[in-house]
Each structure stands twice: as structure tokens, then as C-alpha cells.
């Protein structure tokens, strides 16, 4: 499953929509909730990011992300 994670680069400042960034993770999980938990754990262990939202991408959404040119899987 591919998850899109929206985040702020630091926890020091209050979140601002204009500064929101995204990364993509491939997670092997039994269900969506387990995948979100694993994604959050991976990011918290490997980055100082402030996570805003974690979204499971549908097949159509994934195709759109790939076509937009911003899609790149992040590995830790």
C-alpha cells in the first residue's frame, strides 16, 4: 500500500498550509489503520517532522500522483 504523508519540516513552529510538504511511503500492512500506524512510527523514528495527515492512496490517486511528476517513494 502507498501512503501520502503531509508534514511540516519542524515541530518548533505552528503548522502553516503554505509550508506543508508531502512524501510517499510503501507500507506492507494488513489494513489501512495498521499502515497508518507503521507510517507514523517510521517518520517519527527517522525525521524531526510534524505529521499533519496520512492518506492511503487509491489506484486512481496514485496514477495521478505519478503523472504529476512529484511522486517519489521515500525509504528509511
Curated annotation (Swiss-Prot):
InterPro entries: RpoY. Pfam families: RpoY. Belongs to the RNA polymerase subunit epsilon family. GO terms for cellular component: DNA-directed RNA polymerase complex. Its EC number is 2.7.7.6. HAMAP family: RNApol_bact_RpoY (MF_01553). This is DNA-directed RNA polymerase subunit epsilon.
Amino acid at each position: 500500500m502507498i501512503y501520502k504523508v503531509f508534514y511540516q519540516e519542524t515541530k518548533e513552529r505552528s503548522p502553516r498550509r503554505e509550508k506543508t510538504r508531502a512524501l510517499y511511503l510503501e507500507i506492507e500492512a494488513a489494513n489501512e489503520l495498521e499502515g497508518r500506524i507503521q507510517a507514523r512510527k517510521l517518520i517519527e523514528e527517522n525525521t524531526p517532522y510534524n505529521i499533519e495527515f496520512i492518506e492511503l492512496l487509491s489506484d486512481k490517486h496514485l496514477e495521478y500522483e505519478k503523472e504529476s511528476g512529484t511522486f517519489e517513494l521515500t525509504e528509511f
